[in-house]
């Protein structure tokens, strides 16, 4: 192979830098596990694992983009290389086979990837499309059979709430009584009622899609919406940061 040009040398230098970053991240995680007593917090471990994952992803993308160059390169020592004093490093550079442990990891990863590709139990694209077409209507029908937000389900109310064993020592009130009291309190206020979706069904005819039933909310549902709106709102960015790093979001 001819001598390397500046772009190829730059590619090798970028590979070295990425591998050094990964090595330092792994050493930092191992050191924190071996030296910390008690062990580091979950958020700290999650943060270090995220850094290692990003380093691995960066190396994988870099090696894939420069696969042709890296597969054509051949390492050999020059006349000025200190082979006697740097013999271990030279052996690693001239090694043609993977380390036995690394080779075992690679073989297990390849077997897992092959089994995932051969998995015939997964749904096809047409089956997934049919599932997503069926799910909204069926979920809405099931939701309308439930009494969301109450102390008792519809099945428990049908068989009598006095026969329900809740395991609680406090007295649960019937929702009908609460709704009648709230209705009497809201009489004469003259507030404008917002419309809400109470049903969904598949549109008949040649046109595809769903159609929704619109109705005014009941006093009980309005009260539930006010209770939900009173809760603290967490920004989506804080939620995603908590999912990836484990750092609890700050309520605003």
UniProtKB/Swiss-Prot annotation:
It is found in: Nucleus. Residues 6-30 form a coiled coil. Its main location: nucleus. Residues 170-252 are annotated as: Disordered. Keywords: Activator, Coiled coil, Nucleus, Transcription, Transcription regulation. Gene3D superfamilies: 1.20.58.1710, 6.10.250.2610. InterPro entries: Mediatior_Med8_fun/met. One of its GO terms (cellular component) is mediator complex. GO terms for molecular function: RNA polymerase II cis-regulatory region sequence-specific DNA binding; transcription coregulator activity. Residues 173-196 have a biased composition (Acidic residues). One of its GO terms (biological process) is regulation of transcription by RNA polymerase II. Component of the Mediator complex, a coactivator involved in the regulated transcription of nearly all RNA polymerase II-dependent genes. Mediator functions as a bridge to convey information from gene-specific regulatory proteins to the basal RNA polymerase II transcription machinery. Mediator is recruited to promoters by direct interactions with regulatory proteins and serves as a scaffold for the assembly of a functional preinitiation complex with RNA polymerase II and the general transcription factors. Component of the Mediator complex. Belongs to the Mediator complex subunit 8 family. This is Mediator of RNA polymerase II transcription subunit 8. It comes from Neosartorya fischeri (strain ATCC 1020 / DSM 3700 / CBS 544.65 / FGSC A1164 / JCM 1740 / NRRL 181 / WB 181) (Aspergillus fischerianus). The gene is med8.
């Amino acid at each position: 192979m001819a001598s390397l040009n500046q772009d190829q040398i730059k590619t090798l230098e970028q590979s070295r830098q990425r591998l050094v970053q990964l090595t330092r991240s792994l050493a930092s995680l191992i050191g924190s596990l071996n030296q910390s007593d008690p062990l580091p917090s979950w958020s700290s471990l999650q943060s270090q694992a995220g850094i290692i994952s990003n380093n691995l992803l960066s190396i994988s993308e870099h090696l894939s983009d420069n696969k042709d160059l890296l597969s054509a390169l051949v390492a050999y020592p020059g006349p000025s290389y200190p082979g006697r004093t740097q013999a271990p490093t030279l052996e690693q550079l001239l090694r043609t086979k993977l380390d036995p442990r690394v080779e075992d990891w690679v073989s297990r990863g390849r077997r897992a990837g092959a089994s995932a590709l051969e998995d015939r139990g997964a749904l096809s694209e047409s089956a997934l499309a049919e599932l997503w077409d069926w799910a909204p209507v069926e979920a809405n029908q099931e939701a309308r059979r439930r009494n969301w937000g109450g102390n008792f389900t519809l099945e428990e109310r049908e068989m009598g709430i006095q026969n329900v064993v809740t395991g609680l020592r406090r007295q649960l009130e019937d929702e009908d009584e609460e709704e009648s009291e709230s209705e009497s309190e809201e009489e004469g206020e003259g507030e404008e009622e917002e419309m809400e979706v109470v049903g969904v069904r598949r549109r008949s005819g040649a046109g595809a899609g769903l159609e929704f039933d619109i109705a005014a909310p009941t006093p009980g549902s309005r009260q539930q919406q006010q209770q939900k709106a009173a809760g603290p709102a967490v920004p989506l960015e804080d939620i995603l940061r908590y999912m990836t790093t484990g750092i609890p979001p700050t309520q605003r």
